[in-house]
Amino acid sequence: NGLELRRTIAGMENSMVGQYFIGSGPIHIVAPGGDEVLTRLEQKYYVLPGTKQSYAVEQLVLVVPESLVDAADSLEALSRGTGRLAVADPSHTRLGAQTGVMLRTLGLEASLKGRLDVATDSRGVLDHVLSGQADAGILFGHEAVKAQERVRVVARLEKGYTQTVHSMAMERYCPNRSLCEEFLRYLHSAEAQAIVREAGYGVPAGRRP
């Protein structure tokens, strides 16, 4: 059920592969994060070919202080105003690099020129927004969830950049393949996807029930 999925994903954030108890027994699932690593593991037959299931995508979000009532509700609205936007350093962070690509692709870089507040990393973005140094900031959705008592998400930014897809696959020697298959199918249920969204991730296109 949803609680078990939550525990499984939480465990996988700290360990790439291992036993996770789902229902009546253990399953052996590999969840390395981005699909690039999982594809290499599949090629080496470390995971069972054909079992990879995408369940989440990282997404950028626009955040503002929770206490700010009159806030821009989109990047476009912010670009038309005079507010400052906190972004992570594009030369040292993946967050900053993806943010830069998105702003250029959407044609917003010029309109925000002189109003981009470059922070060291995601923590810096959060600090700049909360201190009033910037009116809004761009974070990954799962980072915004961790700070949801202090900032709120006003827009989910899904266009203009390549989103990182997260998948799981069955370990080659999983002792209970039917149970593994059942769990991998469950990843695409409405219940499981609600948990993924609650954690600040998006659901892969074509995987929505």
What is the predicted role of each segment?
Residues N1-R6, A10, N14-P209:
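Exported/periplasmic ABC-transporter solute-binding proteins
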